[in-house]
């Protein structure tokens, strides 16, 4: 099954993925790899002397144009069974079989990225980045667990030649194992993950940062603990991007992974650091203009879960516009009566945070709705006094 254009463009309260719980493999909504696409080695030669910003723009262009190997477009189902407060839950989520790469199954290049670029791709492909707990779960479920291949630290570890060197070390292991890169198997041990974490926005750093974790030597034995000391523009050879479908199944019903991470009763399924109210990285200014080059990209607009949630009495609503649009953001009660319009007018492409002060309203469930051109999406929030 493949993510449909309509499904990933218009997300509503009731999410209807065009696959079922019986599908063990699904695919990213990107084009088939073009016949004339660059190989991994050719792409390395093209970007090795570029600035990091121009390199990341080139990376996004290649990936959204479909120039990725099969393991970077296939997502495999993982099932979690857990009891919470006496209730039994079965969650099925979908993870890329391996980290993002550019090229073919035979000639590919694992490409480290900054977190904003990884988030840009996730947003455009209806995906999310993993949490620490999800990284552990994915590794434990990996059919092939490779030995990490560290390269001695140096000033060149953030350069394309060292990225390419590390890709070669990983390929050697696959060749020695006789592993078929087109197989439907999850691979672990190849990279550290860029993860979603409360440490993205924590007060222990006064700068935007990337949070990394993983590179397991074995079960419960990662080389890299959770770390948020690197600036957001840092990416070295050991960093990898493994996308997770934002659409999943909980007890047979379709859900969003992002919503699970922000819900008081469910976060424990996928997080071991509590609720993650902002399960995403800040947008990158230098990538915003790229949306105009991908008119058929799956997501033009996105409404995220408010934070905090539950809240008392103020909360923040975040949404993303990939192009200029006439926008209306309103709050309704459960009877469908409009209580307040928070935004009304034309806005440029970008990421927006809108505060709502519910001081004059009673405790309860409220609905906030975003309209932007032909897009419309609603979410629920809880005022708890």
Ranges and model annotations:
Residues 292-385:
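C-terminal outer-membrane/trafficking sorting elements
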Residues 80-112:
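Extracellular adhesion/carbohydrate-recognition regions
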Residues 109-113, 127, 215-287, 382:
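Disulfide-stabilized, aromatic/cysteine-rich ligand-recognition loop
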Residues 7-74, 228, 247, 258, ...:
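N-terminal module-boundary/linker segments of secreted carbohydrate-active enzymes
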Residues 1-9, 290, 320, 374:
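Bacterial Sec-dependent N-terminal signal peptides
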Residues 170-238:
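Extracellular C-type lectin-like domains
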Residues 115-185, 243:
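Conserved hydrophobic ligand-interaction patch in extracellular adhesion modules
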């Amino acid at each position: 099954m493949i993510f449909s254009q309509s499904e990933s463009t218009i997300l509503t309260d009731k999410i209807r993925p065009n696959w079922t719980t019986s599908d063990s493999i699904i695919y990213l909504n990107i084009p088939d790899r073009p016949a004339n696409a660059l190989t991994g080695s050719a792409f390395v030669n093209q970007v090795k002397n570029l600035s990091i910003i121009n390199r990341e723009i080139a990376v996004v262009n290649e990936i959204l144009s479909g120039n990725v190997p099969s393991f970077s477009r296939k997502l495999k189902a993982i099932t979690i069974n857990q009891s919470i407060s006496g209730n039994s839950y079965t969650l099925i989520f979908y993870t890329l079989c391996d980290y993002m790469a550019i090229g073919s199954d035979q000639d590919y290049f694992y490409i480290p990225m900054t977190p904003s670029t990884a988030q840009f791709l996730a947003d455009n492909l209806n995906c999310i980045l993993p949490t620490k707990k999800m990284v552990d779960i994915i590794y434990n479920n990996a059919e092939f667990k490779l030995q990490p291949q560290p390269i001695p630290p140096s000033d060149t570890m953030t350069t394309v030649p060292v990225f390419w060197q590390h890709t070669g070390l990983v390929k050697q292991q696959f060749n020695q194992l006789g592993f078929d890169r087109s197989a439907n198997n999850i691979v672990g041990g190849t990279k550290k993950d860029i993860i979603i974490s409360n440490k993205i926005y924590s007060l222990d750093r006064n700068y935007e940062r990337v949070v990394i974790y993983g590179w397991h030597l074995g079960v419960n034995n990662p080389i890299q603990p959770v770390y948020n000391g690197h600036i957001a523009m840092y990416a070295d050879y050991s960093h990898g991007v493994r996308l997770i479908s934002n659409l999943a199944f909980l007890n047979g019903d379709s859900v969003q992974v992002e919503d699970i991470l922000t819900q008081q009763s469910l976060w424990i399924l996928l997080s071991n650091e509590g609720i993650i109210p902002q399960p995403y990285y800040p947008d990158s200014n230098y990538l915003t203009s790229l949306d105009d080059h991908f008119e058929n990209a799956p997501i033009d607009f996105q409404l995220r879960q408010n934070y905090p949630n539950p809240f008392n009495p103020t909360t923040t609503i975040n949404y993303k516009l990939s192009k200029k649009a006439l926008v209306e953001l309103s709050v309704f009660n459960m009877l469908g009566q409009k209580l307040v319009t928070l935004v009304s007018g034309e806005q440029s492409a970008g990421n927006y945070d809108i505060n709502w002060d519910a001081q004059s309203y009673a405790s309860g469930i409220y609905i906030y709705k975003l309209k932007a051109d032909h897009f419309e999406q609603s979410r629920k929030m809880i005022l708890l006094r």
